Curated annotation (Swiss-Prot):
Residues 258-336 are annotated as: Head domain (RuvB-H). Its main location: cytoplasm. It comes from Shewanella frigidimarina (strain NCIMB 400). SUPFAM superfamilies: P-loop containing nucleoside triphosphate hydrolases (SSF52540), Winged helix' DNA-binding domain (SSF46785). It is found in: Cytoplasm. The gene is ruvB. One of its GO terms (biological process) is DNA recombination. CDD domains: AAA. This is Holliday junction branch migration complex subunit RuvB. Keywords: ATP-binding, Cytoplasm, DNA damage, DNA recombination, DNA repair, DNA-binding, Hydrolase, Nucleotide-binding. Mg(2+) binds at residue 69. Gene3D superfamilies: 1.10.8.60, P-loop containing nucleotide triphosphate hydrolases (3.40.50.300), Winged helix-like DNA-binding domain superfamily/Winged helix DNA-binding domain (1.10.10.10).
Length: 336
């Protein structure tokens, strides 16, 4: 399994959630990046407000750390309603979901993170709640058991997932607004780093912010985490200001290279290059070679490497691209 303290891990770790909450934008106009998604949301939200209706149910999907929870909170703020948050693994029984649904007020947002991990029993309860705003509850046991229907106020369910394909078709079909989040570009991440530095009362110049953004793997959560570590270095070893030189030295010390790779990324790429002659290599063999599981490779390591063109996923397996060889200053062997 992947190490919990991996600095460039996109999943929440340590105090990330608490610190990220302080840095989160509250409204769409404060939100940086994801331009198409933002433009769509503005239209959908304004239309719902004009009609005085609850916003349609929304599925937000994409790699971890890109702001799915932040967007859900922004939607609630823009609509002027409350938000109740939970996650798929927490909702073990139908009663867990029923307790949340019956406490919603009209227009409220129910946010379920990792919605692909809902149990089938809980998912069945969710269908009529999403479609008809009704909750079917079984009263009693055995032959005397009977079903009663409770009316729910109109509400908005926002589901978030890193694995949209793992959702069942009936559940996926009930979301009227599907939104895919993409990795951020360096310019948008630079803006995010600068904004976060201002929240932290940290002095940072443009080149320092760019250097952190370049090594953040297109992910705001990683950018904010790297910024905090660079701040530590700047305060202890320098005058507390973050310049390009300070950022470069601190991140090199943290073993995050100029592509945002750490030892595990390099281990994966070099395994394909050295152990499997550049590929193709099957996922199971690759997982065994680097001592990680399939899910870690597919959900955590691969997306960024594929998006940046270092790995190609083919029907026969994974292949290291020319860019991967160039990164390590290696010559790509010619295939027979």
């Amino acid at each position: 399994m992947i190490e919990a303290d991996r600095l460039i891990q996109p999943q929440v770790q340590g105090q990330d959630e608490l610190i990220d909450r302080a840095m989160r934008p509250k409204m769409l106009d404060e939100y940086t990046g994801q331009d198409d998604t933002r433009a769509q949301l503005k239209v959908f939200i304004q239309a719902a407000i004009n009609r005085r209706e609850a916003l349609d149910h929304m599925l937000i999907f994409g790699p971890p750390g890109l702001g799915k929870t932040t967007l859900a909170m922004i939607v609630a703020n823009e609509m002027g309603v409350n938000i109740k948050s939970t996650s798929g693994p927490v909702l073990e029984k139908a009663g867990d979901l029923a307790a949340l649904l019956t406490n919603l007020e009209e227009g409220d947002v129910l946010f379920i993170d990792e919605i692909h991990r809902l149990s089938p029993v809980v998912e069945e309860i969710l269908y009529p709640a999403m479609e008809d705003y009704q909750l079917d509850i079984m009263i009693g046991d055995g032959p005397a058991a009977r079903s009663i229907k409770l009316d729910l106020p109109p509400f908005t369910l926002i589901g978030a997932t890193t694995r949209a394909g793992a959702l069942t078709s009936p559940l996926r079909a009930r979301f009227g607004i599907p939104l895919r989040l993409e990795f951020y570009n360096v310019a948008d991440l630079t803006t995010i780093v600068t904004r976060s530095a201002n929240v932290m009362n940290l002095e940072i110049d443009e080149q320092g912010a760019i250097e952190i953004a370049k090594r953040s793997r297109g992910t705001p959560r990683i950018a904010n985490r790297l910024l905090r570590r660079v701040r530590d270095y700047a305060e202890v070893k320098h005058d507390g200001k973050v310049s390009q030189t300070v950022a470069e030295y601190a991140l090199d010390l943290l073993d995050v290279d100029d592509q945002g790779f750490d030892y595990l990324d390099r281990k994966l790429l070099l395994a394909i290059i050295d152990k499997f002659m550049g590929g193709p290599v099957g996922l199971d063999n690759l997982a065994a070679a680097i001592g990680e599981d399939r899910e870690t490779i597919e959900d955590v390591l691969e997306p960024f490497l594929i998006q940046q063109g270092f790995i190609q996923r083919t029907p026969r397996g994974r292949i290291a691209s020319q860019r991967a060889y160039d990164h390590f200053s290696l010559v790509r062997p010619e295939k027979a």
